[in-house]
């Protein structure tokens, strides 16, 4: 029997961002009781070079995971290319992807399109933040 996986990420502790604990609490409402939790603290979503994310993907490739649950899409990736690669692996392994706060029916063409539109805006937000940081120096 394949398990659910919950993935949570927070790049920095800020008062205006949802904590890892907050993400986990919301995702647990969607997950089976025995869900595995993968947590990356202090890692950006600009790429997938994150220890817990890589462990989760290894479990997906091994056929151990049947569903991945995130609080919000941008917690898993802020890169169009990385997100597309992840979704290809999920599709090949028949893994369902679920955002606990955004409702996309990825079984339907419109749901898949909306998912891709959201990841475009997640990448745009990351690049805008990077530009602002560079402007301050």
Regions found by a protein language model. Give the residues of each.
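Short, structured surface patches at the beginning of a domain
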Residues: 1-136
């Amino acid at each position: 029997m394949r398990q659910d996986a919950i993935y949570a990420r927070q790049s920095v502790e800020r008062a205006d961002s949802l904590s890892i604990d907050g993400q986990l609490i919301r995702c647990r409402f969607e997950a089976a009781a025995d869900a595995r939790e993968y947590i990356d603290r202090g890692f950006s979503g600009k790429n997938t070079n994150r220890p817990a994310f890589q462990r989760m993907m290894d479990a997906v490739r091994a056929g151990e995971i049947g569903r991945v649950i995130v609080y919000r899409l941008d917690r898993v990736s802020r890169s169009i290319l990385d997100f597309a690669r992840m979704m290809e692996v999920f599709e090949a392994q028949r893994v369902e992807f679920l955002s606990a706060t955004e409702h996309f029916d990825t079984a339907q063409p419109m749901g898949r399109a909306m998912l891709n539109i959201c990841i475009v805006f997640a990448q745009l937000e990351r690049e805008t933040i990077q530009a602002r940081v560079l402007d301050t120096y």
